[in-house]
């Protein structure tokens, strides 16, 4: 069927990642594609996604040796990726022998050759930041190597709504190149403005459909034909309150009062700040407040030393992320 495009728009937690991996698996099974690159906006989200792609590859490609790499500037500090780099290539078994103890999982490695400068995208499977792919459409040295690494693969681009106007322009050029290189592409977004959605379709060479239908939606382009399908919504309710501080009282003080009441009998809460300095100030405030003495406080921002940041990130995933295999057994 040639290169295909899918745009999945749905709220957080609706399974967009699983749907993208399912599509990738179908396209890889067709024999038209040679690998997978999963691109995300940040290093933290890339590290978390590596574990999910690793679990998929281990279950799906049993008995095979596959290269899986993490591509961003601090990948060497990721524990999961470090473990992959220490694995050697196993001795191949005779082709006509299949023992009772034959492996049921893929043997994933991160060969040193692909860890060279600008070579990461040549790995058959990789997870990383979006800039690794965007360098392929910029006038940078050896940009053709990045395009060569992407050619013929399934490429998943996450959080496409999160980029500014400049990066969105680069993203459209990337989508245009990916189609020319024989890639099939999945775009994931929570909410995608119509103008941005139409721009991405034009970059793929597709026409804008007559109507977009209801949200959440799945938009596919196969052989130049655009199809829009509504995804059945799940009944989910949220309670959103706007906190108004009394006259003369700082907003942070009012928010602390609200949290103290909510957490009096236990529970979890996240206080999300727009700057590192503000997050540090809130953290010190809660530390000094006796009403939070029974709470475990965790400060998480991008200015920690790399090793410490990785530890905190792992702790955040452990506390607030999905359960691991060990926890569900």
Task: Indicate where each model-derived feature is located.
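N-terminal helicase ATP-binding lobe
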Residues: 1-329
């Amino acid at each position: 069927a040639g290169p295909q495009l899918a745009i999945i728009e749905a709220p957080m937690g609706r399974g967009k990642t699983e749907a993208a991996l399912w599509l990738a698996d179908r396209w890889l099974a067709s024999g038209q594609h040679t690998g997978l690159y999963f691109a995300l906006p940040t290093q933290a989200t890339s590290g978390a996604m590596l574990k999910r792609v690793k679990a998929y590859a281990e279950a799906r490609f049993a008995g095979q040796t596959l290269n899986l790499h993490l591509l961003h500037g601090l990948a060497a500090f990721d524990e999961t990726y470090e473990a992959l780099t220490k694995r050697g290539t196993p001795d191949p078994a005779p082709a006509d022998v299949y023992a009772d103890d034959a492996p049921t999982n893929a043997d994933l490695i991160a060969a040193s050759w692909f860890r060279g400068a600008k070579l990461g995208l040549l790995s058959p499977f990789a997870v990383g930041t979006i800039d690794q792919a965007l360098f392929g459409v910029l006038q940078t040295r050896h940009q053709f190597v990045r395009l060569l690494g992407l050619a013929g693969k399934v490429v998943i681009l996450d959080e496409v709504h999160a980029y500014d106007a400049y990066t969105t322009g680069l993203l459209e050029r990337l989508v245009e190149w990916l189609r020319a290189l024989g890639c099939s592409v999945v775009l994931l977004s929570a909410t995608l403005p119509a103008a941005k959605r139409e721009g991405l379709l034009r970059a793929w060479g597709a026409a804008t459909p007559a109507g977009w239908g209801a949200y959440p939606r799945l938009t596919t382009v196969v052989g130049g034909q655009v199809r829009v399908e509504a995804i059945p919504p799940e009944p989910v309710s949220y309670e959103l309150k706007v906190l108004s501080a009394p006259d003369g009282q700082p907003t942070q003080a009012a928010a602390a009062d609200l949290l103290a009441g909510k957490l009096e009998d236990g529970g979890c809460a996240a206080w999300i700040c727009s700057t590192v300095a503000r997050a540090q100030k809130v953290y010190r405030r809660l530390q000094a407040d006796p009403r939070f003495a029974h709470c475990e406080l965790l400060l998480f921002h991008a200015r920690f030393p790399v090793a410490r940041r990785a530890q905190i990130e792992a702790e955040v995933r452990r506390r607030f992320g999905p359960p691991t295999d060990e926890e569900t057994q």
